[in-house]
């Protein structure tokens, strides 16, 4: 079952991206390196509820 999640920048705490993930294959929280337009840099984005 795929669920929609939000990714939050770890530097400035802005929620920049939404994506989907399969909870069966990825039971933990996602961490992706994405571009943050507020920081003007690539930063780690963590999954939030």
From Swiss-Prot:
Provide the alphabetized UniProt keywords: Ribonucleoprotein, Ribosomal protein
InterPro entries named in the record: Ribosomal_bL33, Ribosomal_bL33_CS, Ribosomal_bL33_sf, Ribosomal_zn-bd
Q: What GO terms fall under cellular component here?
A: cytoplasm; ribonucleoprotein complex; ribosome
Q: Which domain of life is it from?
A: Bacteria
Molecular function as annotated in GO: structural constituent of ribosome
Q: Might you name a Gene Ontology BP term for this protein? A: translation
What family, per the record? Belongs to the bacterial ribosomal protein bL33 family.
Q: What is this protein called?
A: Large ribosomal subunit protein bL33
What is the scientific name of the source organism?
A: Carboxydothermus hydrogenoformans (strain ATCC BAA-161 / DSM 6008 / Z-2901)
Name of the gene encoding the protein in the UniProt record: rpmG
